[in-house]
Regions:
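A generic local structural motif
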Residues: 2-4, 89-91, 108, 112
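Residues embedded in well-ordered beta-strands
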Residues: 16, 102-104
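Flexible hinge/capping segments at coil-to-helix
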Residues: 96, 105-114
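Extracytoplasmic small-molecule ligand-binding "clamshell" domains
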Residues: 1-81, 86
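Ligand-binding "clamshell"
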Residues: 85-99
Length: 114
């Protein structure tokens, strides 16, 4: 196993992942054990496995709440969108997901371009 002190983790062998529950595309529900399920928790678990660690989830209602917890030693990694203000206190890696979104209008709407 990797020396835990090399990574500055609080709990030996455990990766604490900050998870934003506010995006249903990335967190889709809960497992039978009550852990969050979806893309973000799966990626956090895969990262932990890659290092030989277990994972624990620290859940927050919004990405802002995850970011605000950065100084509270509540998580070791978090999975939120990059933002210039957040980058002042959080170091971001490349994107792990891209979400394509669009605007919808009712049939017959005069709005054709936004």
């Amino acid at each position: 196993m990797i020396d835990i002190e090399d990574y500055g983790l609080t709990e030996p062998g455990k990766l604490r992942a900050g998870i934003n529950l506010g995006n249903v595309l990335l967190v889709t529900g809960k497992t039978e054990t009550g852990n969050p399920s979806g893309v973000s928790p799966a990626i956090a678990a895969a990262i932990a496995r890659n290092f030989g660690f277990s994972v624990s989830y620290c859940t927050y209602p919004s990405p802002g709440a995850v970011a605000d917890a950065v100084d509270g030693d509540e998580w070791d990694i978090c999975l939120i969108a990059e933002d210039p203000k957040r980058a002042e206190t959080i170091e971001f890696c490349g994107a792990y997901a891209e979400i394509e979104a669009t605007y919808l209008v009712p049939a017959g709407s005069k709005l054709k371009n936004i």
